[in-house]
UniProtKB/Swiss-Prot annotation:
Main location class: cytoplasm
GO cellular component: cytoplasm
Subcellular location field: Cytoplasm
One Pfam assignment: DAPG_hydrolase
Stored InterPro entries: DAPG_hydrolase
Protein name per Swiss-Prot or TrEMBL: Phloretin hydrolase
E.C. numbers: 3.7.1.4
Length: 274
């Protein structure tokens, strides 16, 4: 199955309510999305990376430490065991770790417009449960996703789809929390996605030049079992078709290019209106 990922022409934006048009950050919905760099579009259209370049889920602490140079850091592919990988690295000038710690909980509460401005063509809503935990001023900003589920509607290629993202404390995801706060991992968020294709997800970031380097990994084909363990979700001998990670890669490079463009001013304007 071949997919045509043409990102050169703008798509149709999702709908907004009249109440959303009155919000102070509606202007970010109205503006054009930031263009995806040509080199990333070339990677998208260039086909999957080799299976041996897909970092195994069991080696995820290498990713956190920044000791994963033998693996790809931008691209998509299918691993030898049939699971799939999406990886992306985004330089975000003018962005700080504090802004990203704020962004991930902020966009999941309040108006649906908060999620829409991230990618106005593909994002419909993201709603946190329990929202009371997210908005609790006693919860540290970098912990406001821990144990929180985001109920989402977005389009990563095939059409709008419902998704549940189960965010985890890093230790519950199998991460060594002593790595957090070190040179290659200032902070992170991690979650298990429940949808038509289960996946484990991590976004981490650290200072780089005059901003941050934002690094994403999606291990497609993993789920949470009854005991709370993250396990492979596909049968032996079955492989995820390459168009699945390709579609997610296309979406990822689009949404995080746009987030990098809007976050510095958005944070300056909205950081006190959680």
């Amino acid at each position: 199955m071949e997919e045509d990922f043409n990102m050169s022409t703008p798509g149709v934006k999702v709908g907004v309510x009249e109440e959303e048009k009155k919000l102070s950050y509606y202007k970010y919905y109205e503006q054009d999305l930031a263009p995806v760099p040509a080199e990333k579009i070339a990677i998208l259209q260039g086909g999957p990376i080799a299976p041996e370049k897909c970092i195994p889920f069991d080696e995820r602490n290498k990713f956190l430490k920044g000791e994963d140079d033998e693996y790809a850091n931008i691209g998509f592919g299918v691993a030898a065991d049939g699971t799939a990988l999406v990886c992306n690295t985004t330089y975000m000038p003018g962005v700080t770790g504090e802004m990203l710690d704020w962004w991930f909980p902020w966009h999941s509460v309040g108006s649906d417009l908060r999620y829409k401005i991230w990618d106005p063509e593909d994002h419909y809503f993201a709603r946190a449960y329990p929202a009371s935990y997210v908005v609790d001023p006693n919860v540290p900003m970098n912990q406001k996703t821990w144990g929180v589920d985001h109920y989402i509607m977005e389009d990563v290629g095939p059409g709008p789809e419902f998704l549940k993202l189960c965010f985890k404390r890093p230790a519950d995801f199998g991460y060594d929390e002593s790595i957090i706060g070190t040179e290659k991992c200032e902070s992170l968020v991690c979650a298990i996605g429940e949808s038509s294709c289960a996946a484990a997800m991590t976004h981490k970031w650290h200072p780089y030049k005059d901003g941050v380097l934002f690094e994403s990994r999606f291990w497609i084909g993993y789920r949470i079992d009854e005991e709370g363990n993250i396990v492979k979700a596909i049968p032996e001998g079955v492989s995820i078709p390459p168009f699945v990670p390709q579609g997610l890669f296309a979406h990822n490079i689009k949404e995080f290019t746009n987030l990098a463009a809007i976050l510095p001013t958005l944070y300056a304007e909205e950081k006190d209106t959680f």
